[in-house]
């Protein structure tokens, strides 16, 4: 796994994330300083079930399997986020592992990023919290074997 800062030049990449698309260019430039890029090869583990989580990854390229108790419960790709529940809940244990199935590139947002958003951009924090609640509900449905749209 390779990891590096995207710096303020990554502002447009942040705006491509649907949750952040309403931000101004200046807001994205400020937030980009707190974001890293991760690049992975197939088979590499991005997150491990049971580990403490303090980062979320928004996938830009590639795909990964979400694995819970040894069973693949979802496949994610560009535009999807993984690990955000632990970050939004200000830390917690990972509920699943995430393993790259193709070459993968994504943006890493930390709990520090979310703390800054909550302090400086409360309206955005509300949108993110609402999305997280929907994600939790989808996970609950998926775990109970019910269809998820």
Where is each model-derived feature located?
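Cytosolic regulatory regions built on CNB/CRP/Popeye-like sensor folds
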Residues: 1-149
């Amino acid at each position: 796994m390779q990891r590096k800062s995207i710096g303020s030049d990554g502002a447009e990449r942040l705006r491509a994330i649907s949750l952040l698309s309403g931000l101004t260019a200046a807001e994205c430039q400020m937030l980009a300083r707190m974001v890293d890029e991760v690049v992975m090869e197939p088979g590499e583990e991005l997150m491990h079930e049971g580990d403490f989580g303090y980062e979320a990854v928004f996938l830009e390229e590639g795909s990964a399997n979400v694995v819970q108790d040894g069973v693949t419960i979802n496949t994610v790709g560009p535009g999807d986020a993984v690990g955000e529940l632990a970050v939004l809940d200000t830390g917690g244990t990972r509920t699943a592992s995430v393993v790259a199935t193709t070459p993968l590139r994504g943006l890493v947002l930390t709990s520090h990023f979310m703390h800054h958003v909550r302090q400086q951009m409360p309206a955005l924090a509300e949108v993110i919290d609402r999305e997280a609640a929907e994600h939790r509900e989808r996970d609950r449905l998926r775990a109970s074997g019910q269809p998820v749209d």
